[in-house]
Structure formats: C-alpha cells, structure tokens
Amino acid sequence: MKKLLFLIFCFGCIACTTSGSSQADKNQNNPSKEDAQVSSPVVMNPQHQAFALWISGLSTQDTSAGYLKYQESSNNIWRKVVAGKINPILNFRDSFLAPVKKVRKLFYPFSGGDFLYANVFFPEIDTLIMVGLEPPGSLFIPDSLPTPERQSYLSKLSQSLFFSNELGFFRTLSMEKELKQIRLNGTLHPIVFYLARSGYQINRILPSKLLSDGSLAVSADTSRTQSNIIYYQKAGETKERVLYYFSIDLSDSGLKQTPAFTQFLKNQGEFGVFLKAASYLLHQAPFSTIRGHILEQSSVLLQDDSGVPLKFLKNQFDDIQVFGEYTQTIPLFASFYQPELKSLFADSAKVRKTGFIIGYNQQFRQTNLIFAKKMRTL
C-alpha cells in the first residue's frame, strides 16, 4: 500500500498531462526541450508543493508540537541567513554584477544541493543545470510515517543544511553521509527546502533519465534515477522555470561513461556559469573536458578561486573583474594557490569588498569573487 501511495505521489503529475494541450503533452514527454517562455498550461502536482512547504517549515497543515518546534527553529535560522548572507549579496550583486540579470540559463557544476546561492546571484534564470556526485533523491509522503520518523527526518535535514546556512557551501564529506539515508536520500531535499524558502512554488518534480541524444525522459524506476527535473515558478509570475539536477562524475573518465550528459550540455548552447567551493577540481588535468565546455559555452562566469584557474580564463574572456580579498588558500588546498590571481587583488583601493563571507576562506574572514564576461555575448 505504501509503495502504491509513493508511486501516486511521485507520478500523479504525469497523469494530469493527459487532459492538457498537445504542447504540454509534448513538453512533458521530452522535458529537456521545454522552453520556459512558451505559454502552455502549467501542470501541477499539489502533493509536491505540500511536501516543499512541509520540509521548509512553512506548512500550516502540520500542527504537531514537534513540527511547530521545527518551524520556529527553521524561521530563526532563515532570518539569520537572510540578514547575514542573502541581503548583503543582493546589495553587492545589484551594485557590481548587473550582467548576471541577463543570464537566463545557468550551469552550476559541483553544486550539490545549493539552489540558494545560484538563485541569489542569478535571479532571472529560466533554466538551472546543477550537477554533483550526490544522488538526486526522491520524495515521500510525510503522513505515511509515524511521528517519530517524521521528526527524525526533519532533524537530519536541518543538520544537512548547517554548513550551507553558516558557511555558504555544502561540505562534500558531509553530503556523502547525510544525503544517503532512507528518507533523506539525495539533493532533492535541500534543493526543495531552498526553493520554498526563496518564495517559489513547486509545480512538479519528475525523476528522469538521459537518452543518447542528450534529451531526457521521465523515469518510473526511482531506484535507478540519475536525475530530477523540477518545474517551479515565482508567485505572481506566469513564467515557469526548470531546474535539472544530475548525479554525474564530471571527471574526464566519468564523462566518457556518460556521453549522453556531454550531448545534453552541448544541446544547451550558451549559458552562464557559477562555481563556488568546487574543491579546485578544474585546476586539475582529469577535469579538462568539463573545463573546456565551461570555457567554450559560457557567456559570463562567476566563481571563487576554487573554479577555473585564471590562466585559462584570460584566453577566453574579454573582461575579468575581481572582488573581495585573496591572500591565501586553506592548507588543504595550498597547492592550488595562484600568485597571478593575487596580483589582480594587489590594488586594494580599486578592488571592491563584497560585504559578505562565503566559501573556503571563512577562517581568514575572506571572500574572493572572479567575474568574467565575454563582451561579444553580453
């Protein structure tokens, strides 16, 4: 019975499309080719929105004592995130990063479940492509669980969000453990939490699989799902947005095993790129293929020093600006320090401060941002 409820919960939205327009049906079956700007009936799965409200502490339906306590805690934490991270970033973005508002499609490799900062820095995107090693995850019906299990899940979810809320990034080692549990089983959970807290409505969530031509098909086998597609929109907007999350190894060897993703990326054409707390993987030879896609297909790139090394950026971008401070890397990544990048930060009178701290250099009270633009495309 629970299995039946789960299938109805996850795929009820598919049945809803049978009574929609032919355009909506076509888009449902081949979601990677859906144009967010096309005016077509929005397909809703109310259970997906209800789940998003519940895990984000915004539901008015659960009045249990345990949930009300979780709700109060979530509200308090969110207020701190807004005051300490979001508002300072918004002020900085609007003052110094105006071109990001022109970006409609964003690629965020090594993202984990970090929808929050992608959305804050790039507020107008219609399409968000997120990639990480962590599993995509699946939803469940909260009411199908005993109260102790629901409370255990919410406690574990809060724990998994700690580093993102406090430091501005997810720790890879923590995610490996925290997002591979029975209920908290992938990045879908932090993504949905941040979507709801950011004021978005979840229209539907579709487990999916890549096809050889780089398109996506809805997958009924959630145990083997490699990706999730989330359709969402802002209150008061008619435009529907789409988020793709892929669980893929972006190393050269990993991409050889998943050529369909490489084709998917090529099919996207030009996009903006966001990189943060990326473990300096793009500094390393085994990640040269994905680095090449980033350099070739990006119109604008916003990153910290853990992203693409400066020596590669200089050959592809017409304008490179730096913000914040860059004097060192943490000991774990000391070998990736860039003296050439430090020289760009040398004139502190000309380099604007960020007014916020996110990323690896928390212990030094430093944040660095690199903003690169191809003038011919913006």
List each model region and its residues.
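Short, thiol/selenol-centered motifs that function as redox-active sites or metal-ligating centers
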Residues: S111-F122, I129, L167-H189
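Short, intrinsically disordered low-complexity segments
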Residues: D143-F169, G214-I229
